[in-house]
């Protein structure tokens, strides 16, 4: 409805109210938007009609006819919407024209305010000039109240009326679009929504059940872990007992170790006793005198016996020093003839140097820090002992 305040406000207030806004700038922007939207709707309707005409030849059957009918209805509705939009630019254009008309018809606010200022000054000086300014004061009131006020009020009211009419035109709703799908589409959409809700509820229930099972499995795993922890603690508690059981056999082995210590200490004494019991172990196997010179065979046997005895001593003495053999120098013994002339020795006769076997010296094994025994007879000359040479006398009966 029109604004009833136009007649109640002063002329300058109405003019300021009309010109206080943004002017026609917003009206022009709105008009351009409506024009663009209408052109878009028209272009879409035309394109849809062309597409329908181009593809209708390849459609067959009842479905093809129904589809073509639906497309035609939708295109008609789109064109109707475009027609509804086409009205809006004209409405906005009318509003722009109404504003410009009202703005031009309004008495400007400065003019109205100047009238009031002059009226006030005249009233102030009128008594001093013997009321000669009274006609001017009356004319100012007539102009202000008889012309400016009614004019601005009328212009504002007219402008308000035009805008009210245009607002009613803008309030007309757009045409209702026809249903391009099946009439059962809303019911199917509602069923789809219900099915989606049911599936969502079922999914929530399954998730809740899974979470419950998972929580139960977690509790069972925790119980099993608690049992394992108890078993570990029990085994830890039994470890001191196992250590005690392992220490008992070691304690029983200690007395046997104490018995073995004296036996180990007696082993050097036993070795010394065995050494004195066996002369060969002390290197005395070679000290036996040589065999009689009565027969060569007996001498050879005695020499062999001496060597055997020395070998036995070496065998009993151990492997501390290897057995050595040597032949005494010739200057240490008498010659075979002792300076007496003898006949020629027949072949096959044995002399002293042949019968006498080489002296064998066997070293003993060091026992308990004792020095190694000297070879039997090997170093007797150095100790001043006399050596008795073994000789063989051969009698030649062929004379």
Swiss-Prot record:
Family matches, as SUPFAM superfamilies: PE/PPE dimer-like
Region (Disordered): 375-399
Family membership: Belongs to the mycobacterial PPE family.
Species this protein is from: Mycobacterium tuberculosis (strain ATCC 25618 / H37Rv)
Name of the protein: Uncharacterized PPE family protein PPE69
Gene3D superfamilies noted in UniProt: PPE superfamily
Superkingdom, taxonomy of origin: Bacteria
